[in-house]
Regions:
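Class I Rossmann-like S-adenosyl-L-methionine
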Residues: 1-215
């Protein structure tokens, strides 16, 4: 909620700087801003799955070479079998929301491939792949660290979001915070992930009562 409080305070500031004090317009701007931030949050979660898809494609391409190397024939499949990412990939909630918001990395395949190539050169990725440790907790800890240290800091990703919406220029930290919180709350026993209920906060945030705006 702290991230959304910040967003609401920004809108408060803009409202009180507006000579016309048009509360309907302020409400509309706030809702639009929160909606776009939620969409960005879905893009980030979906990117995790997209990275695994690229890893799978890389392995398949190696196996289909005319003269595959021993590494091509016997690849390290630790990342492609990461159980935590598989939960995200199989999430009906995430897939449905992605479809609803037209979040589709397959339409940005070349960009996501470049991001993938950059990420697999990181030391955290290499250490994870070389570690003999396995299991959901290990997979989750890696992803959390990998996401915070690397995925959200890729310049190509920043450029992509900036081109998608000028509203996203300052919102990456907020959306990333939401994604990180979501990752932290998922457990091995969960049948599906739980997205942060941003729509509930929007209802509170756009209320015309100033008291209700502090939540």
């Amino acid at each position: 909620r702290r991230h959304l409080r910040i967003k609401v305070l920004h809108c408060f500031y803009a409202y009180f700087q507006d000579e016309e004090k048009d509360i309907a317009r302020a409400d509309m701007q706030l809702k639009s801003s929160l909606d776009k931030m939620f969409e960005m949050y879905i893009w980030l979660l979906s990117l995790v799955v997209e990275m695994q898809d690229h890893a799978i494609a890389k392995i398949e391409a190696g196996r289909n070479k005319k003269l595959p190397s021993p590494e091509d024939l016997h690849p390290n499949t630790k990342f492609v079998t990461n159980s935590f990412i598989r939960l995200l990939a199989n999430s009906k909630i995430l897939n449905n929301k992605s479809e609803e918001l037209s979040v589709n990395w397959s339409q940005e395949r070349e960009l996501s491939k470049k991001i993938f190539k950059e990420l697999i050169t990181t030391e955290d990725y290499k250490e994870y792949m070389e570690s003999p440790e396995r299991g959901f907790s290990h997979d989750k800890e890696f992803l959390l660290r990998f996401f915070k240290r690397h995925m959200i800091n890729v310049e190509l990703l920043h450029d992509f979001f900036e081109e998608k919406s000028v509203l996203w220029t300052d919102d990456l930290d907020l959306a990333a915070g939401m994604a990180i919180k979501t990752i932290k709350t998922i457990s091995e026993d969960d049948a599906d992930l739980t997205l942060l209920p941003l729509t509930l906060y929007i209802v509170c945030a756009i209320s015309s009562s100033p008291v209700r705006l502090i939540f």
